[in-house]
Amino acid sequence: MNLKEYIPVVPNWPKPGVNFLDISGITINPLAMSYCVERLVKCITDNDITSIVAVDSRGFLFAGAAGIQSATPVVLARKKGKLPGECYSHTYATEYSTDTVELQKNSVLGARPLIMDDLLATGGTILAVNYLIKQNFTVESVFAAVVINLKFLPGEKQLADHSILLTSIVNYE
């Protein structure tokens, strides 16, 4: 299945000069969504993943579905102030500004967590979540899975430089 057919490009959004790849074309099509989730589940089972760390907010869509199908727990990585209880927190630079991501201190990740998001561009968000995981939890390896990988941007290399093993479903060269 060519998922690029289901990903419309929205020019000049969220700011001028940015061509936004809209994953809602996948989420509104059950066949495309199912195909995507099957690929993510394969990544989970092939790598003996112990938990999925879902990135706020579009990562939740894919992580929830993949978690159910693979019987893998889903932990939420959210923007600052969105999680109850005590949290670990890390501020990082994004493509457009700075942001803060948090994980609950009582999260159970296991030895092989998988960070899941909709899109990889510069890698900032996944690297921030990776930082939180490695600073605060005991893990063997950290993996990442994204629906869309913008290979012309430095994200994939940034993840490799931090020993994060990446699976991507749709690649844009």
Regions found by a protein language model. Give the residues of each.
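PRPP-associated nucleotide enzymes
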Residues: 1-173
